[in-house]
A protein has these predicted regions:
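Cytoplasmic membrane-interface "Motif A"-like loop-to-helix N-cap segments
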Residues: 102-114, 325-337
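Extracytoplasmic gate region of multi-pass secondary transporters
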Residues: 55, 262-312, 405-409
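Hydrophobic core of transmembrane alpha-helices in multi-pass small-molecule transporters
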Residues: 132-152, 356-371
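Extracellular/periplasmic helix-loop-helix junction of adjacent transmembrane segments
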Residues: 58-91, 138
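C-terminal transmembrane helical hairpin of 12-TM major facilitator-type secondary transporters
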Residues: 329-376
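Helix-to-loop junctions at the C-terminal end of transmembrane segments
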Residues: 93-105, 316-328
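Glycine-rich segments within core transmembrane alpha-helices of 12-TM secondary carriers
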Residues: 173-197, 220, 394-408
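C-terminal ends and interior cores of transmembrane alpha-helices
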Residues: 67, 114-133, 337-353
């Protein structure tokens, strides 16, 4: 196998150690890295602020937009609208991913921020069902579609952006800040809803109080847009783009993406499945499960979830450090095993009716989730090569979230209603854990290694020189995968 040119159309950079030169090693700009992490995490926080608010207001939203004599039916209708946004996420990934691979990660992430803020802000302006009838849920549905389309390019782009800006040694730590933003967004959303429940009467919440969290998205979006517009493009993309422009006709199209990288796409979908089923089960579905299924006071359930997330935030950063030191595989495999062993006991604790035992059950699930949230943002981008990273990650991530993660609240609520078994969420988590364990059989350890398709990334010139003198690998794979027969021009033309 020969070394590739500096920017192979399908695989990006690939060289063997004996041909590597010190000036080819990326030296990361630390101040720019911090700004990149902050801007990416803020965008993710805003996305999950909205999802958290919607999940914690599901009962209220059901009453405002879906009048019914059955409270459970209202919650299911609200979660159905919540789920619709996930159905359009793959379309967003299909559009924004190739754009990010061709024109740059920074430009696309700025645009997704605008759309996300507009979609969330507009929800706060929609009149209730009693005022405009059927148009209320229709407008809510349209706003959720805008949100879903924009978020289709958000996580894949943000994870790619942080991964490509980070050094190889601390990519896990830097990536963990992305999910720190997720938890921060959830806490901000849940905290706002909880404060509103405590300060306002039920009538005030139904009348206007529920609108406040959505209207906050406007100024948050402007702040996020400003931060992202001040960023530079990632070093990995700049290095590839300069050479790729000389061979425009060689850019891999979507057909080649699925043919060459199909296995990694499936692996990514499996990892995202177990990650997001756990995420949405705990952070989005549990508040409604506690109040509707278990008859627990709504404000108390929200408060317990907030406390769990507050504990998870610093642990997420610690988990990022561990993923760099111990590896991504031990973290993810350990979390899957924990779900298999603890899911049923945790749900029994949650259903006990005792505040302390409920918190213990939720916290144990939160600890398993931390192992995912701290390691996935560095694991998923490392599955793919630089020329297709944004496209592949966005498509695989959003298809998996749409089919499995985002549907978790709706499917679980429906199954609990149909079966009458309060342990259904535990069985659901155990099934996801099995899929996660099987998927990990096909995942290589990437901690401390360069991203596929990118040269090694270090913190200073001294580290670059030391890398050349060491025996440390400079690529994840010893060889590149073989290219299929791409005689069909549709397979080699640009994706967009």
């Amino acid at each position: 196998m020969q070394d590739t040119p500096d920017a192979h159309a399908h695989f990006g950079w690939f060289k063997r150690r004996r041909h590597l030169k010190v000036d080819e090693i990326t030296v990361v700009d630390k101040p720019m890295l911090k700004r990149a992490v902050g801007a990416a995490a803020l965008g993710n926080a805003m996305e999950w602020f909205d999802f958290g608010v919607y999940g914690y207001l599901a009962v209220t939203i059901g009453q405002v937009f879906f009048p019914s004599s059955n409270p459970t039916a209202q919650v299911i209708a609200a979660f159905a609208t919540f789920t619709v946004a996930f159905l359009v996420r793959p379309l967003g990934g299909l559009v924004f991913g190739p754009l990010g691979d061709r024109y740059g990660r920074q430009k696309v992430l700025a645009f997704t921020m605008i759309l996300m803020a507009l979609g969330t802000f507009s929800i706060g302006l929609i009149p209730a069902y009693e005022r405009i009838g059927i148009w209320a849920p229709v407008l809510l549905l349209l706003a959720r579609v805008v949100q879903g389309f924009s978020t289709g390019g958000e996580y894949g782009g943000a994870a790619t952006f942080i991964a490509e800006y980070s050094t190889d040694r601390n990519r896990g730590l830097m990536g963990s800040w992305l999910e720190f933003g997720t938890l921060g967004g959830y806490i901000a959303g849940a905290g706002t809803v909880t404060a509103l429940h405590m300060l306002l009467s039920s009538e005030q919440m139904l009348d206007w109080g529920w609108r406040i969290p959505f209207l906050v998205a406007g100024p948050l979006g402007l702040l996020g847009l400003y931060m992202r517009m001040k960023l530079e493009e990632t070093p990995a993309f700049r290095a590839f783009a300069e050479e790729a422009e000389k061979r425009e006709h060689d850019r891999p199209g979507l057909g080649a993406l699925f043919q060459v990288h199909g296995r990694q796409l499936l692996v990514c979908m499996g990892l995202v499945l177990v990650f997001n089923v756990t995420d949405y089960m705990l952070l989005t579905y549990m508040p409604s499960y506690l109040s509707v299924t278990m008859g627990y006071a709504e404000s108390k359930g929200l408060l317990l979830i907030i406390i769990v997330m507050l504990v998870m935030m610093p642990l997420n950063i610690v988990g990022g450090v561990f993923s760099d030191k111990l590896g991504r595989r031990p973290m993810i495999i350990g979390a899957c095993i924990a779900l298999l062993v603890l899911a049923v006991p945790c749900l029994l604790l949650v259903g006990s009716g005792n505040d302390g035992l409920i918190f213990l059950g939720l916290m144990l699930l939160g600890l398993a989730l931390v192992c995912f949230t701290s390691s996935m943002p560095s694991t998923l981008p490392a599955l793919f090569y630089t020329p297709v990273r944004y496209s592949a990650l966005s498509i695989a991530f959003n298809v998996s979230v749409s089919l499995f993660g985002g549907t978790t609240p709706l499917v679980t609520a429906w199954l609990v209603e149909r079966t009458g078994d309060p342990l259904v969420p535990a069985y659901y988590l155990m099934g996801a854990a099995v899929i996660g364990l099987v998927t990990m059989l096909f995942v290589k350890e990437t901690a401390g290694l360069p991203l596929r398709g990118s040269p090694p990334a270090v913190g200073c010139r001294k580290e670059a020189a030391a890398l050349l003198m060491s025996d440390a690998p400079v690529t994840v794979d010893p060889d590149l995968p073989p290219l299929p027969d791409v005689a069909d021009p549709e397979q080699v033309k640009p994706a967009l």
